[in-house]
Regions:
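Flavin (FAD/FMN)-binding glycine-rich loop and adjacent Rossmann-like elements that form
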Residues: 1-2, 6-173
Length: 173
């Protein structure tokens, strides 16, 4: 019989004892050129979106006490743009070195710290006068997962399948 586990983290497959993997395999295992030279246990992190709105009038912002000081913790290769929101802030990510199945709540709180801290910086640093009339309209509360368990089956989809657009009769990996 065929079954599709669409629970999100493969809960049904995991509880049934199905073999799975987490993290990236080495380049050598499947001959994937873009894979890392050696396997590692880190995963892609979780993301939370947030949206801003221009109210047309000045709006003050007071960050919650748990907001992160992003001037000390966000890598310097990133910059902030007061007009960016939602999908343009995809890089607001955290949790790749944690257990993305079981630590989602902890990851969510860290993401909130970053988001509220980033908005505090945008609103109150004085570097973004265009943000004076903007408000933080909405902040997500369920992190978007980018990676979790990958179950092993009769066939495992590899990089070449995607790049070469290989056809598979069952269209399932």
């Amino acid at each position: 019989p065929l079954f599709c586990d669409a629970s999100g983290d493969g809960v049904v497959g995991f509880l049934s004892g199905a073999p799975y993997r987490m993290g990236a395999e080495s380049r050598e295992e499947f001959g994937e050129k873009f894979a890392p030279a050696e396997d590692y246990g880190e995963l892609l992190g979780h993301s939370l979106y947030f949206y801003t709105k221009d109210t047309g009038k000045p709006v003050k912002y007071v960050a919650p006490s748990y907001a992160m000081d992003v001037t000390k913790t966000v890598p310097r290769f990133r910059s902030f743009n007061a007009k960016e929101h939602g999908c343009k802030l995809w890089w607001v990510e955290y949790g790749g070195d944690l257990d993305t199945v079981h630590d989602t709540e902890q990851i969510k709180w860290e993401l909130w710290k970053v988001i509220y801290g980033a908005w505090d910086y945008i609103k109150n640093s004085g570097k973004y006068p265009e943000a004076e009339t903007m408000t933080l309209e909405w902040v997500g509360c369920i992190p978007g997962k980018r990676e979790s368990r990958r179950f092993e089956g009769d066939y495992m989809l590899i990089q070449q399948d995607v790049i070469e657009q290989r056809h598979h009769e069952d269209a399932v990996s």
